[in-house]
Amino acid sequence: INLLAQSRKHSLALVTASKADNLYWLGRYTERVFTTLNQFFPFYDRVMDTDVDAFRPFARALDLPEDFQDFDAFIHSFLYDEKNPDSVRSAIVYAFNNAVILRPELSSRLLQYVELAMSSIVEAADRAAFDEDIYKHRDIADNMLAFWGGVENSPVDPTLKSFIFVGKYLERVDLYTRFG
């Protein structure tokens, strides 16, 4: 296999500053959603087992308030509040907004995974009072994994893929450094 000849067939995509910004933040926001949910549930499980203080390290890592007067209201705000810019729902909406702008480069097929995650968080918010919302979070995490796998295996220009994955891995380093 002549890799050099094959690499010459791929032209570099024109990457404007705004496109690079959208790709980068798409990667960051999708990673923020995925990692936050994966880190959230072990702490949440311990709280449900009657240890409210177990959630404080998670809150501290994300610079969230640690004194919860109403823990349920705090959780609802953290996961579902569309007016809270630090909520998981807001991160999904931000990812979706970036993905929509990039539809010509990424394709509708890849955009659908972010859109499905957004639908799932909205549905989870509607069911939060009934404790049925927890199951939707697995779907959201799965949609993020499907999105990244789809990007990796798509014919999207490697330069564009790189911007997404740079954002993704920088967010991962940031979050895992916080969580320790």
Model feature map: region roles:
Residues I1-G180:
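Alpha-helical transmembrane segments and their helix-helix packing motifs
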